[in-house]
Amino acid sequence: MTWKIVTDSGCDLRSLTRQSKELRFERVPLTLQIGTEIFRDDDGLDIDNMMTTMYQSSKATTSSCPSPEAFLQAYRGSDNVIVMTITGTLSGSHNSARLAKNELLEENPNVNIHLIDSLSAGGEMDLLVLELERLINLGLSFEEVVKQITAYQQKTRLIFVLAKVDNLVKNGRLSKLVGKVIGLLNIRMVGKASNKGTLELLQKARGQKKAVSALIEEIQKEGYVGGKVYIAHAQNPKICEQISEKIKSLYPDAVIQTGRTSGLCSFYAEDGGLLMGYEI
């Protein structure tokens, strides 16, 4: 039996830890538009160049979800397919993935396919994909993998820290005044993904050190006691070090992984931001 894990580019991972003929990973890219320029969030995207273009532009920026056909092409070729998308509250990606699932089953009624709305993005999606890989490599049945990943999702959370909000201001989601205040006062916005998949602001912290303290406080409120952590950062390895050191000082056995944000997550987290997934 062959397996495939399919995500959109709300997931930061570019590959699995151990890919094989029996287990493959496919990431279906969203597209990002800055003025008249289009950036496809695939392995060839120069994220630093995209971010430079974004900061040089005064025009509104947008993201577009993959088409059902793009998902359908990614689904084909395996007996068992597990699909995970960025939260359906922020993107039409989940709906495209659902339409493609229906088309696949019309083509091949014998394929096993399960679709997951991550209700999240970035680091939490990354944790979920890594757990999927682990479960599949255990040799579990399709039904058991679905059962266990559904239970695991109840134990994962997302917290984020934003150091810049230029994009939110350009797109009218924050006022220009608030954006200027955040920039001038070195404010960091700390928030989370709710259990409904919406993004909620938790705290405003002045400076990175206080933002790290706020993050630790908030994950402990959620029930964090040393579970796995995945930190996806946008050009800010320093904050990853600070968070890792703090977590390790409190929970020495915690397993912490870090990586760069995808184009999509960089687009919204902006320079200096992060999206951290963790287990409770």
Swiss-Prot record:
InterPro entries: DegV, DegV_C, DegV_domain_contain. One of its GO terms (molecular function) is lipid binding. It comes from the Bacteria. Disulfide bonds: none annotated. Residues 3-280 form the DegV domain. PROSITE patterns: DEGV (PS51482). The keyword Ubl conjugation does not apply. The keyword Nucleotidyltransferase does not apply. Keywords: Lipid-binding. Hexadecanoate binds at residues 63, 91. May bind long-chain fatty acids, such as palmitate, and may play a role in lipid transport or fatty acid metabolism. PANTHER family: DEGV DOMAIN-CONTAINING PROTEIN DR_1986-RELATED, FATTY ACID-BINDING PROTEIN TM_1468. This is DegV domain-containing protein spyM18_1709. The lineage of its organism: Bacteria, Bacillati, Bacillota, Bacilli, Lactobacillales.
